[in-house]
Amino acid sequence: VVKKGIENLGFMVETPMSVRYLEEIQNYAKFLSVGTNDLWSLYTGKSRGSSDIREQVNERFGEVLKEILQKSMVPVSVCGALASDEEGLKFLLKLGYRSFSVSPSFFVRAVEIVEDFDG
C-alpha cells in the first residue's frame, strides 16, 4: 500500500469477527476505528435503529470495547452514535478511549465533556 502512496490505511472494527481477528488485522492497518452502531447491533441481534443508544452503555458491551483496546497495537478511535451521546462519551472515556468522531451538533458538548473528564 505504501508503494502506492497510501501510508495510513485503517480498519473499521464493526463485526464480532473483526474483534476476534484483531491481531492479524493490525499487521496491515495503521489505525482502527470502532463502529459502535454495527458492532453493538451484531453482538445483540438488534436492529441498528431499533433502540435507544443508551442501551449500548452496559457492562457486557463495555467488555467487548475493552477487549478491542487491550488487543490494539495501533491508534484506536470510536465512531458511531455512542460517541455522540453524553452518557455514551463518558462511558467510552471511562473505558479508556481517547479518540472520537462525533456529530457536528454534539461537538461543542463533546469538548466540554472531555475537558471535564477526571480520569
Regions found by a protein language model. Name each.
Residues V1-G119:
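Conserved alpha/beta-domain cores
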